[in-house]
């Protein structure tokens, strides 16, 4: 199985879309202080994906047949099903297959993301090839993988 391990912020959700969820939430009626983010409807919960980034992502997925594994911190704010619904809303041709696990360890975001990817790969031996697309520089942690 081919896998694309995908971050969101800085990859498919570019800086010009950051905060778009707040506008959507306001239009929806506003998030109450007592509400967790998971209680906000999926279509209002996340920032918008960039249309050009989605086009490129769809081309890569179609050309390679890769499955998506989400490494983004967005995994903290919804289920795999929620993320699949959001991918549909954003026009992504495939729903995510899985999330990388959350590593209970201290360290930089780059280290933790690298360890999460490594743990996911260790638990999924059927992966024949993979790539991680992330705006974090994880080159210092290639020894993890």
Residue ranges of each PLM-predicted region?
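Short His-Asn-centered micro-motif
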Residues: 6, 71-77, 133-135
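Short coil/turn segments at beta-strand junctions that form active-site/ligand-binding loops
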Residues: 1-2, 64-66, 126-129
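Substrate-recognition element of Asp-dependent hydrolases with the DxDx(T/V) motif
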Residues: 64-83
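Short, solvent-exposed loop/turn segments at secondary-structure junctions
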Residues: 11-12, 19, 75-77, 136-139
């Amino acid at each position: 199985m081919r896998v694309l391990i995908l971050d969101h912020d800085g990859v498919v959700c570019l800086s010009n879309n950051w905060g778009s969820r707040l506008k959507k939430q306001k239009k929806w009626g506003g998030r109450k202080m007592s509400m967790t983010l998971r209680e906000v409807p999926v279509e209002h919960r996340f920032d918008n994906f960039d249309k050009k980034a989605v086009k490129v992502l769809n081309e890569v997925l179609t050309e390679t047949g890769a499955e998506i594994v989400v490494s983004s911190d967005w995994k903290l704010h919804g289920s795999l099903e929620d993320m699949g619904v959001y991918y549909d809303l954003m026009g992504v041709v495939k729903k995510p297959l899985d999330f990388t696990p959350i590593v209970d360890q201290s360290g930089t975001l780059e280290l933790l993301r690298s360890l999460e990817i490594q743990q996911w790969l260790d638990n999924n031996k059927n992966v024949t090839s993979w790539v991680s697309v992330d705006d974090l520089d994880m080159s210092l942690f290639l020894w993890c993988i």
